Structure formats: structure tokens, C-alpha cells
Amino acid sequence: HVRIKSQAIYGEAYYDINDTTKLTLGFRYDDLTNATTTFNGGLLASNWIAAGGPLFENRMDVPGLTSYLVQNDSATNGMVAIQKYLQDDVMVYASYTTASKGAGVNGGTDPVPYDQEDTGVIDFGIKAKLLDGAMLLNMNVFQNDNSGMLLATIRNTEAFNINVDAEVTGFEGLMKVF
């Protein structure tokens, strides 16, 4: 049985520096609790439910309960971005964003916790309508610095999350001609 409680507050503010330049600031606070209860099922499952299940006062005394794990995390993240119109149809931008994904517990008969993932992303790009609006062009370069990046692996028949540190650098482009 998994019980997740998540609360967050977030907001963004925009400021027009001038007619062609806009600054965006963002903030997010997350509070996450992830509780996993494992029991061996069968007839004992009905005893666990009859005893109140996850509301049972002393969970470790419930017949058939094999583990009870709780992961608590909180994170504060932010974003700053600036966009500049070079022409009516051509805009360049730069941004820096942080993000988090809360810790959790891998499922299965022997649950193992995994840590929170934290990411910082820097992004530079251009968005343009060219050729009198006949072509849409979007391009950007980015770099993600991941601390505890979550990777899902398969162990036997179960998905199992692990944390690794990683740096991802890339280029994306989209061109549509109408």
C-alpha cells in the first residue's frame, strides 16, 4: 500500500523591462511524504484492513506487516528567464531553472527507498517566424546538471528506481514550412 501526500505553493512574476524585453521570475516550494506499507497478503490482508489499515495506531503490530517505510522531502526551486524580441517575429531567450522530484520507495516484497532528484537547467534559444510567416523555426541549446537523477531499471519483473549523478547537454530544433 502506498500513500503519498504532496503540498506545494508556486508563483511567477513578469516584468517588462522595455517594449521588447521581458523578465520572468518563478518560485516553487514542495513538501512530500511518501509512505509504503508491505504485508504478506492472504488472510492477513483482511486482518490488516479490519484493524484500520494505514490508520492503525501501531502499524508494526498489524498481523502480516513486513515493512513500513516513510520518505519525507521538501524542496525550494526557482526560475529566472529573460526574453528579447529582436524583431516582431524573432525572439531570443535565456533561462535558468531548478527542479526537484521527491524521494520515494521502490515497490515489491522488499521495498528499498530512493533519494530525491535535484536538477539545474540552463537554456538558450531562438523562436522565429521567417519567410513572411511561411517558416516556423525554434532552436535551443541546454545543459542539465542532475544530482540524484532517477533512472528506472528492471529487476526480475519489477521496476526499480536508482539515483545517479548526470550532466546532459543538448540541442533541439524544430522547423516547419507551411
Feature-to-residue mapping (PLM):
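Structural signature of Gram-negative outer-membrane beta-barrels, strongest in the C-terminal barrel
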Residues: 2-144
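A generic beta-sheet turn/junction motif
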Residues: 130-132, 168, 177
